[in-house]
Swiss-Prot record:
Glycans are attached at residues 4, 176, 188. A lipid is attached at residue 355 (S-palmitoyl cysteine). Its main location: membrane. It comes from Sus scrofa (Pig). This is Type-1 angiotensin II receptor. The keyword Manganese does not apply. Angiotensin II binds at residues 15, 17, 167, 182-184, 199. Pfam families: 7tm_1. The gene is AGTR1. Gene3D superfamilies: Rhodopsin 7-helix transmembrane proteins.
Length: 359
């Protein structure tokens, strides 16, 4: 969608140079359906994650704090998803007013940054817990985890401020519809560049590099531990899990980030072809479904790596109430071996200790 401003009114009036871009009947049916599925699955799954972690597991570990906040961030986003489903089903006609336009848009942006930052911190926590279990004891505390989550929520809110400021309701004169969209004045070309690059770099590239580095180091440490303890059979599931975590994150977000970058080029007028604009506007909601559906499954995905999480989750599904006493924290297959150098410089392996527990 290429928008040009014409007149100013209570609702700003603009022109769309490519009015048919992204407007296909199958999009107006398929995307609301996918949004509805994401909403139902996401609300159900993330609500159960919150209940399991808070009431059954008693929020005892650092990783459980990150997972709880991840689920809460997803729930905040999911609550606005029906608005986007209606918006798309109405062929991109926004009936909810300017305030809800800003709030719903900011929720999408907030969830992107909060979830990515939390996953990044979770990967760092896994690295410290598995590779440096003894050294990281004093740093991996509940207080540090809670303060980190507060900082993440503040940073995600700060990163979403431009969306609150610049996302508005506009009336497109040549199509006679009201949309909730970004609109950039031609002379203010630095804004879309800044927003697009922030989303690409801060919302994907840097976090992915940190996640990739963390799990690569975990991979190497566990591999070395198995080589040292040759009499112990190698559990390849550990390495499959690590590979799945990295690939899951990468392929969930790469399509959306690519089309976000192309959309910035269109908004800047670098790309003028309406055929390309149609491809981008058609693909964008599909990539959003992919990214945010996987995003909403993350708490379940990470949680089910832990045996105790699975146990309590199944208990909850069977309506078995949590016991009054506190439960010990989650552990996963990645915590069956921890690796650390001994004091004399040689390498040693040991069975998992509480400091290596993943959730």
């Amino acid at each position: 969608m290429i928008l040009n401003s014409s007149t100013e009114d209570s609702i700003k009036r603009i022109q769309d140079d490519c009015p048919k871009a992204g407007r296909h009947n199958y999009i107006f049916v398929m995307i609301p359906t996918l949004y509805s599925i994401i909403f139902v699955v996401g609300i159900f799954g993330n609500s159960l994650v919150v209940i399991v972690i808070y009431f059954y597991m008693k929020l005892k570990t650092v990783a459980s704090v990150f997972l709880l906040n991840l689920a809460l961030a997803d729930l905040c986003f999911l609550l606005t998803l029906p608005l986007w489903a209606v918006y798309t089903a109405m062929e991109y006609r926004w009936p909810f007013g300017n305030y809800l336009c800003k709030i719903a848009s900011a929720s999408v942006s907030f969830n992107l940054y909060a979830s990515v930052f939390l996953l990044t911190c979770l990967s760092i926590d896994r690295y410290l817990a598995i590779v440096h279990p003894m050294k990281s004891r004093l740093r991996r505390t509940m207080l540090v985890a809670k303060v980190t989550c507060i900082i993440i929520w503040l940073l995600a809110g700060l990163a979403s401020l431009p969306t609150i400021i610049h996302r508005n309701v506009f009336f497109i004169e040549n199509t006679n519809i009201t949309v909730c969209a970004f609109h950039y004045e031609s002379q203010n070309s630095t804004l879309p560049v800044g927003l697009g690059l922030t989303k690409n770099i801060l919302g994907f590239l840097f976090p992915f590099l940190i996640i990739l580095t963390s799990y690569t180091l975990i991979w190497k440490a566990l591999k070395k531990a198995y080589e040292i303890q040759k009499n112990k059979p190698r559990n390849d599931d550990i390495f499959k899990i690590i590979m799945a975590i990295v690939l899951f994150f990468f392929f969930s977000w790469v399509p959306h980030q690519i089309f976000t970058f192309l959309d910035v080029l269109i908004q800047l007028g670098i790309i003028h072809d309406c055929k390309i604009a149609d491809i981008v506007d058609t693909a964008m909601p599909i990539t959003i479904c992919l990214a945010y559906f996987n995003n909403c499954l993350n708490p379940l995905f990470y949680g089910f790596l832990g045996k105790k999480f699975k146990k309590y989750f199944l208990q909850l599904l069977k309506y078995i109430p949590p016991k009054a006493k506190s439960h010990s924290s989650l552990s996963t297959k990645m915590s069956t071996l921890s690796y650390r150098p001994s004091e004399n410089g040689s390498s040693s392996t040991k069975k998992s200790a509480p400091c290596t527990e993943v959730e």
